[in-house]
Each structure stands twice: as structure tokens, then as C-alpha cells.
Regions:
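Conserved FAD-binding catalytic core of PHBH/FMO-like flavoproteins
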Residues: 1-121, 125-131
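Hydrophobic/aromatic residues within well-ordered alpha-helical segments
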Residues: 64, 95, 159, 185-188
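Conserved phosphate-binding and hydrolysis motifs of nucleotide-dependent enzymes
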Residues: 2, 139, 152
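A conserved FAD-binding loop/helix module that cradles the flavin
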Residues: 147-158
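Short, histidine-centered active-site or binding-site loop motifs used for metal coordination
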Residues: 74-76, 141-142, 196
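C-terminal helical "tail/cap" subdomain of flavin- and related membrane-associated enzymes
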Residues: 165-213
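Short FAD-binding loop at a beta-strand-to-alpha-helix junction that anchors the flavin cofactor
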Residues: 130-147
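Hydrophobic, well-ordered secondary-structure elements that form the walls
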Residues: 140, 160, 181
Length: 213
């Protein structure tokens, strides 16, 4: 039932399961590059576009209608942070100085800025993922992660595949299946989260190095 799972909350409060939610120091906001007048993409549609700036970044992914969904990942507070961007003048100055080749692609930048929410990012860790043979959490309820490795949904699908295999292996003995599932999948959930945080550093910082390409 998702990253803010009620089932997990009940497991933690009733059975004293380990639980940690780590909200990272960066928030994000989505913006949109519209299509060109002829309906075509203004940037290469077959590329992942990243503007790496060390501690923060902007990225853009192509949509089928000629637009690009863009996401700014920036610190909550401090230099180059969301807390500094509270007026039209501040937002336009920020993008003009930090992303000068981007601002011209979004003519309604400030109206988008005001309309789209600034949202947080975090990682969920809990252990175990089951209560005997009565209940089990999978997907984001068990291992919600940040999006920088692009494998969160795949990890959830993998949960389903492994769970089906274990149900067969244990002849649908839920208690035995759930216990093994929790032990087998927990390290994988942690691993995807660690890789996601590592890749955030790579994307926002390391991709600026010509040697990376």
C-alpha cells in the first residue's frame, strides 16, 4: 500500500519492527519544455538531458507529444536552494545564471514554478517485511527509494516474481514463504536504495567531467 503504508505502520507499532524513514536534503520540482511550433522536440528526443551542477541538477526526459518533462533537484536550504526562490525575479535570475541554455526553452517558467509543487524525497527501510504467515509488505511499502537509479518499479515487480516462486517452493505455506521472502529480498531492497543514492551523486556531479563521457 505504498511508501506511506498503513500496514507497515501497524507492523511497527504492534510488533516493534525496525523502521527508518530518511528524507534526503534535496527536494524536487517538475517543469515542462513545450514542443516547438512544428510539434517537434526542442532537444534531442533520444537522450537523457542532465545539467549537472555539483550539489544539484536539472534533468529532462522526452515525451511523445514533443515536450520534455524536466525535474530540478536542489537543496532544501542554503546556496542554490529552494528556500531562496520565492519571487519571479529570484527564479528568473537563478535559471539565467545557473541554467542559461535552459531558460529560453520555457517561456512560462515562473507560472509553471508557482503551479507545480515542491516535493520531498526519502528512503524507507524496515525489518522484517512480514508478520509470520499473516501479512507481508512488498514494493514501496517495504523499500521505497529515491528515483536516481530508475529501478524502483522494477524492484517491486521483482518482489512479485520472487514471491510467486517462493509460494510454489513452499507449496503455498504462507508462514515459511513469508519468512524466506523477507530474508531474501531485504538485502536487495537495501541495495537498490544504496545504488540510487550513489547514482544521484554521479548524475549531479560526475557527469560534468568530460572523462565521464
Amino acid at each position: 500500500d505504498g511508501a506511506f503504508s498503513i500496514i507497515r505502520k501497524k507492523m511497527v507499532s504492534t510488533y516493534n519492527h525496525k523502521y527508518d524513514y530518511n528524507e534526503i536534503d534535496h527536494d524536487y520540482k517538475e517543469l515542462l519544455i513545450p514542443p516547438a511550433e512544428d510539434g517537434k522536440h526542442l532537444l534531442d528526443m533520444n537522450a537523457l538531458h542532465i545539467w549537472p551542477r555539483g550539489d544539484f541538477m536539472l534533468m529532462a526526459l522526452a515525451n511523445q507529444d514533443g515536450s520534455f518533462t524536466c525535474t530540478l533537484f536542489a537543496p532544501k536550504k542554503g546556496k542554490n536552494s529552494f528556500e531562496k526562490l520565492n519571487s519571479k525575479q529570484e527564479v528568473e535570475k537563478y535559471f539565467s545564471s545557473v541554467f542559461p541554455d535552459f531558460i529560453g526553452l520555457v517561456p512560462d517558467l515562473y507560472s509553471q514554478w508557482c503551479a507545480n509543487p515542491t516535493s520531498s524525497l526519502g528512503i524507507v527501510r524496515t525489518d522484517p517485511w512480514n508478520v509470520k504467515g499473516t501479512s507481508l509488505i512488498i514494493g514501496d511499502a517495504a523499500h521505497a527509494t529515491v528515483p536516481f537509479y530508475g529501478q524502483g518499479m522494477n524492484a517491486g515487480f521483482e518482489d512479485c516474481r520472487i514471491l510467486n516462486e517462493l509460494l510454489d517452493n513452499h507449496n503455498e505455506n504462507f508462514a515459511a514463504c513469508f519468512e524466506e521472502y523477507s530474508k531474501v529480498r531485504k538485502p536487495n531492497g537495501d541495495g537498490v536504495q544504496d545504488l540510487s543514492m550513489h547514482n544521484f551523486i554521479v548524475m549531479r556531479d560526475k557527469t560534468a567531467d568530460p572523462k565521464f563521457l
